[in-house]
Each structure stands twice: as C-alpha cells, then as structure tokens.
C-alpha cells in the first residue's frame, strides 16, 4: 500500500536542496530577499519540532560573480577558485539570515568519499547528528574546491539524496525552477500532465525524465529521478517543487504544484535490511546473555557485554554479533576497530577514555547501526532438536 502524503511539519527530519538559480542572480549576485524568506520557512518548520538540513548550491555561481569571471564554461581550476570564494560568501549569507531567527548555521563540505566510504560516512553522519542535537541547521554542499571531474557527485540532487539516506531523513525536498514531474515536457506538449503522486519509480517514470542526452535531462529532471531512486529506496519520501515563490515551503504547504514520491519503507527498516542482507561480516563480537537481552529490547551494544572479539575489522565495517548460545543473533556496523574493541571488551563505557586515551563512543555498536538476524528465545533450534529426537526414537 502506498503511503499517504503528509504535511511538511509532520515529518521528523527534512533535507531541503536548493538550486543555484534560486539563490544567485548572474548579474546582481545573492538574492537576499529570497534567502531571508526561505530561512523564515525553515524557522517555521523548526518551531514545530522538525529537524532541517539544507543542501545549498550557489558557491561557484557566487564566486564567479565576485571574481567577475567571464560567461561561458569554466576551466576546472577556474571553477575550483570560484567555489573557494563563493563558499565563504554562501556560508556567511546563510548564517546571517538564519541568525535573525536565533538559529545557528553549520557549514559542511562533502566529497564523494564521505558518503561512499563507510568510515568517512560514519564520521560525517556523526558530525551532522551532533549539529542537529545542538539545534544547528547544517548547510551542506559539495567541496568543489577539491572535487575533480572524475571524482564528484556532479549535481546536488544526488548529493542531497545521499545526505538524506545518511542521516535517516524521512523527507527530501528538491527546490529548483522545476515544479514537478510531467508526463511529457510541458513546453513542448500542451497535453502534458503533472504527476502529483508517484507511488514507485518505474521504467515508465524514468522515461518521462528523459535519457542522459535529452533536452529534458539537461533541465535537471533526470538527476532528480536518480535522487528519487536513492531516497525512496532508503525509505525517504521526496518532493519536487518550484522554489521560485518567495516562501517556497509555505507555497508547497498551501497546495502549490509539486510531485510527491512515496517511500519504499521507513528509513530504519530499509537501512537495516541493507546491513543484514547485503554485507559480509568482517569479524564478530561474542556477547553475554545480559547484552543479548538488551539488544532484543532495542538497546545499543555496550563494551561491558562483549566477551570476545574475532577477526580484523575497521570502524564502520559490518560485524556479526554472536549470542550466548554461540549462534549469530545480529549484525551491525562496528563503532571501533578490532584492536580497540579487544582493549575495551568487558569494560564499562566510562573506562573507554582511560583505556584508549580518547573519549570514544559509548556503544560498541549503536542501535541505529544494528539489526537482529535471529528470533528470540532460540525457538527454531529447539523445535529442530525435538524433531531430530522423534526421528531417532
């Protein structure tokens, strides 16, 4: 059954992607009045308890204006120089506009490896999570000063989708000059219809976005559908809407034209399915009965409950968790590498800093990174043993 669309303030954590054209005028630079209105919308969402993250384009466009670079395509080094200048301008603009609502902005610049390599992924996620806990609004962009043509996201639609899945967001909003997905290019086909709800991204839906070399894809719809596949598969709903109104989020709430893409499942369920089913464990942790009970009640795995560490693994690698019966009961992402795990196994969390020399995480495997893979109580094994007994009677 397709999930129903909700009001924006009914979501828990929302990632908003903002296109360059919304923020920057090629001749005059930053569109401050639009940015101020956008920040007012963000403040209104936060006042209702919604956590908000922003993926903001515009650094290269702003830097280009400040440096007075000529029109047309930029060389890689020119683009990187423009990004270096523009990132400062962009971060300051967001900080100043959000501060009028007593909101602190935090800048995060990501490269492709920060979401594709698990250790860096965990570090980036931890930083973003801490910013959210401190009440800050993370302003995220690709680090175009070091990204190359070969190693980069290439567009902020897909970057925003990666961020949304990383932080477990339940809604991704893509704001640009496109107000939704149409059955055909509306400027070419007067009969084109806006799809207000997309239950699933099928091959037919992908075809509506155009191929890689189509005119429509150059307008950005293809990358938005790619972003939708990333987000919805991970349990995150997505909205494509126009950012042209001065209060774009308020316009969406008021029923403005947009397309809503239904999520495949909850963020936690989809992510834990990925952990359990697609990754081979690099090692294992054997735990006691008390720790097993804690895990089955939804708690994190603390060092005190770990009795043995097996294998050679790094922080962020997938590991198996072996219960008191000797069977695998769960899988998760390691909060420590194998060497550190061996040092703190069986110890209290308060002792970690003394043993390792730094204040590490309290959990060996955090509950958000853990999925149970065996039923409780050992019922399946017990029934199997009974069956064997009857067979030999």
Curated annotation (Swiss-Prot):
Gene3D superfamilies (UniProt xref): Acetylglutamate kinase-like (3.40.1160.10), PUA domain (2.30.130.10)
SUPFAM superfamilies linked: Carbamate kinase-like, PUA domain-like
Pathway: Amino-acid biosynthesis; L-proline biosynthesis; L-glutamate 5-semialdehyde from L-glutamate: step 1/2
GO biological process, one term: L-proline biosynthetic process
Predominant localisation class: cytoplasm
E.C. designation(s): 2.7.2.11
Binding annotation for ATP: 17, 176-177
Molecular-function annotations in GO: ATP binding; glutamate 5-kinase activity; RNA binding
Disulfide bonds: none
Keywords on record: Amino-acid biosynthesis, ATP-binding, Cytoplasm, Kinase, Nucleotide-binding, Proline biosynthesis, Transferase
Ligand binding (substrate): 57, 144, 156
Superkingdom classification of source: Bacteria
Catalytic activity: L-glutamate + ATP = L-glutamyl 5-phosphate + ADP
Family designation: Belongs to the glutamate 5-kinase family.
Protein name per the record: Glutamate 5-kinase
Gene: proB
